[in-house]
Swiss-Prot record:
<comment type="subunit">
    <text>Monomer.</text>
</comment>
<keyword id="KW-0568">Pathogenesis-related protein</keyword>
<dbReference type="GO" id="GO:0006952">
    <property type="term" value="P:defense response"/>
</dbReference>
<dbReference type="GO" id="GO:0005737">
    <property type="term" value="C:cytoplasm"/>
</dbReference>
<dbReference type="InterPro" id="IPR000916">
    <property type="entry name" value="Bet_v_I/MLP"/>
</dbReference>
<dbReference type="GO" id="GO:0038023">
    <property type="term" value="F:signaling receptor activity"/>
</dbReference>
<dbReference type="GO" id="GO:0009738">
    <property type="term" value="P:abscisic acid-activated signaling pathway"/>
</dbReference>
<dbReference type="GO" id="GO:0010427">
    <property type="term" value="F:abscisic acid binding"/>
</dbReference>
<keyword id="KW-0020">Allergen</keyword>
<dbReference type="Pfam" id="PF00407">
    <property type="entry name" value="Bet_v_1"/>
</dbReference>
<protein>
    <recommendedName>
        <fullName>Dau c 1 isoallergen Dau c 1.0401</fullName>
    </recommendedName>
</protein>
<comment type="similarity">
    <text>Belongs to the BetVI family.</text>
</comment>
<dbReference type="InterPro" id="IPR023393">
    <property type="entry name" value="START-like_dom_sf"/>
</dbReference>
<dbReference type="GO" id="GO:0004864">
    <property type="term" value="F:protein phosphatase inhibitor activity"/>
</dbReference>
<keyword id="KW-0611">Plant defense</keyword>
<dbReference type="InterPro" id="IPR024949">
    <property type="entry name" value="Bet_v_I_allergen"/>
</dbReference>
<dbReference type="GO" id="GO:0005634">
    <property type="term" value="C:nucleus"/>
</dbReference>
Amino acid sequence: MGVQKTEAEVTSSVSAEKLFKALCLDIDTLLPQVLPGAIKSSETLEGDGGVGTVKLVHLGDASPFKTMKQKVDAIDKESFTYAYSIIDGDILLGFIESINNHFAYVPNADGGCTVKSTITFNTKGDAVVPEENIKFANDQNRAIFQAVEAYLIAN
């Protein structure tokens, strides 16, 4: 299995607690409001929202993909960290075994926060994820972050 990793960091004037809640705990209800083309629906297949929960996400018309199945790997409401894996769906392109996503919301002295993200692509065999797919994943995360951040600032 091949492994490719990408990391990103962005700062926000919104607190770590507020961004963590919006982007990790309330994302299924909030995202369709702030970025309507991103997700059509999300249904819980297993679990209660905690670690081990499996969700089937039907992506919106703005996405070139239709579905993805996500599994919550870790949630820490005190340190504002969240991790989930994409374990199935056309988003895996047939040659990716899984995509692990880890987010840490680090409080800043000014009341805002720094969001650190790591995306790990686990490929089948010797497959390599093309750079444009890695860029697409980072761009999608950035677009979601910016839309939710703007919503939180406005409300």
